[in-house]
């Protein structure tokens, strides 16, 4: 039952992230990418901290499952490690803007669904045939959904792939840390790191004007509270029960949600190819869950 609830939480997070591209696009038209990432992270830190203070019972309910395994200093370092990895994933992805097409970038980014299981195998996790079949179908589906032109490898594509590696590593380090650190504390620390790095670089590389920030206050608040605050905290809570390779597959649905959101909200068009791609992704993810609990190495309790 806890696993099912965690999967529902992660699906909710994916829906938020899939729709967040609208706010991201609005904010990015006025502010630089580092400024957007830094401010949304700062807003998220304030939001989560206020919730922890005002609802202490909620904070206590997120106590680590492996009590006593990590000292206070280790918990802090785990949070910093998660934040550093997340920052590089987000920043490297931003570097690629304009260097490749959005479709190719979307496809290459979700290749972390392959990277995470690959890393997991070296860490001792076992994958069953259903997961492998589902993974292959998901990759094919994302290609149909995202790549609309001939696929040729360029520098921008390599940069996106590097960011995908960092996103995959982030899922792995969250999987380790979530069992040892309070979920809300871990979320706060990692977002503090992202905010410091992003705003620090933004002050050097970008021009920050208060009037510009105020002009996109609404999308920034939505990004900070919903996408970063609830989103990354929800991911940590969910990963206490869900193995990392399953997490990566569920999180990859963000691209599908974004495509559907584009149709419903921005009146974008989805053709037969993209529709087939989304269907193949969904079928692949459903297949990947068959007999999942029987073949996976159980998580530590």
Where are these regions (language model features)?
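Hydrophobic transmembrane alpha-helices of multi-pass small-molecule transport proteins
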Residues: 48, 127-147, 167, 198, ...
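Glycine-/small-residue-enriched transmembrane alpha-helix faces in small-molecule transporters
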Residues: 1-38, 84, 88, 92-95, ...
């Amino acid at each position: 039952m806890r696993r099912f609830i965690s999967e529902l939480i992660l699906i909710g997070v994916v829906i938020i992230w899939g729709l967040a591209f609208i706010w991201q696009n609005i904010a990015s038209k006025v502010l630089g990418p580092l400024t957007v990432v830094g401010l949304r992270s700062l807003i998220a830190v304030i939001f989560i901290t206020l919730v922890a203070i005002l609802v202490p019972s909620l904070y206590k309910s997120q106590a680590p499952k492996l009590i006593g395994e990590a000292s206070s200093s280790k918990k802090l370092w785990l949070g910093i490690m998660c934040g550093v990895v997340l920052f590089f994933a987000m920043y490297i992805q931003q570097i690629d803007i304009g260097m490749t097409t959005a479709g190719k970038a979307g496809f290459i980014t979700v290749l972390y669904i392959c990277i995470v299981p690959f890393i997991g195998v070296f860490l001792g996790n076992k994958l069953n045939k259903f997961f492998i079949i589902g993974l292959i179908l998901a990759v094919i589906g994302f290609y149909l959904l995202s790549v609309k032109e001939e696929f040729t490898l360029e520098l921008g594509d390599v940069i996106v792939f590097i960011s995908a590696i960092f996103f995959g590593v982030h899922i792995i380090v969250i999987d380790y840390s979530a069992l040892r650190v309070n979920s809300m504390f871990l979320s706060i620390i990692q977002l503090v790191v992202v905010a410091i790095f992003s705003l620090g670089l933004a002050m050097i590389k970008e021009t920050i004007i208060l009037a510009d920030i105020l002009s996109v206050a609404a999308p920034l608040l939505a990004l900070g509270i919903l996408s970063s605050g609830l989103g990354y905290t929800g991911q940590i809570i969910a990963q206490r029960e869900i193995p990392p390779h399953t997490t990566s597959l569920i999180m990859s649905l963000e691209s599908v949600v974004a495509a559907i959101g584009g149709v419903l909200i921005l009146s974008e068009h989805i053709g037969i190819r993209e529709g087939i791609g989304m269907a193949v992704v969904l079928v692949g993810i459903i297949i990947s869950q068959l007999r999942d609990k029987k073949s996976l190495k159980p998580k530590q309790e």
